[in-house]
Amino acid sequence: MGQKIHPTGFRLPVTRNWSSRWYANNRNFAGMLAEDIEVREFLKKKLKNAAVSRVTIERPAKNARITIYSARPGVVIGKKGEDIENLKLELAKMLKVPVAVNIEEVRKPEVDAQLIAESITQQLEKRIMFRRAMKRAMQNAMRLGAQGIKIMSAGRLNGIEIARTEWYREGRVPLHTLRADIDYGTAEAKTTYGVIGVKVWVYRGDRLANGDAPVMRGEDRPEDDRRRRNPRGDRPGDRRGPGAGRGGPGAGRGPADGASAAPSGDAKPGVKRVVRAAPPAAKGE
């Protein structure tokens, strides 16, 4: 059921990591989880034009550390760092603890699934044909290093009366392979006909457990450098014949009694002649 389950949750113990990294007891867990959801919704609205890919939240020792991954870090920081300072104050008021905000730049937004989904929804809201937007995003992703991409759009596409689902795929998208680095993102386009949902899967190669080291494939493995051993009969100084040392019944024996040796080449095998003895004469004859 790799096609139905959430790709990130499916790979959490293997190649992915949690977006919220903290520990809480049973009494405080629900409240802290609700705060994380509230912070993410606030940042999504506040930084709508900053191309935010994802947000990670850490809570070390009565503090909070929030990392924002954005393709436009300058929009988040603002002029002379004013916007990020105001953002820290608002987040500290929400979480009621000191907050440190870090900005990480997304180098290739064309390969980020969340940014691809948001880009397609923005084009759909501007009345651009959904097929054109999807195929353009797929071409850009494959050109910049993605090994596979799948995009699905669902809703009243092109304003039709009955909602439907269409998807396109290019390259490989192995959803069942746990070591595959599958990036997944969703977004919604609010059009005059209704809401259109967009889902994006991007395959960026294979990874080892929670690391960036690529997995060596079968065709990329180096050849075995060990020196292969020659057959026993070809070894120098071996006085035994090529068939010596073989086990099994009849090993080392010559031909059976009364049987001719095995023919060599194209010579026809000899025919064994059988002579029957005459029966003994009856008594009294």
From Swiss-Prot:
UniProt entry tagged with the keyword Phosphoprotein: no
Record keywords: Ribonucleoprotein, Ribosomal protein, RNA-binding, rRNA-binding
Protein's UniProt keywords contain Membrane: no
Feature: compositional bias, Gly residues: 242-255
Segments of skewed composition (Basic and acidic residues): 217-241
Region of interest: Disordered: 211-285
Disulfide bridge positions per record: none
A Gene Ontology term for the protein's cellular component: cytosolic small ribosomal subunit
Pfam families in the record: KH_2, Ribosomal_S3_C
Residue spans of biased composition, Low complexity class: 256-267, 276-285
KH type-2 domain sequence ranges: 39-107
Subunit structure: Part of the 30S ribosomal subunit. Forms a tight complex with proteins S10 and S14.
Its job: Binds the lower part of the 30S subunit head. Binds mRNA in the 70S ribosome, positioning it for translation.
Protein's recorded name: Small ribosomal subunit protein uS3
Name of the encoding gene: rpsC
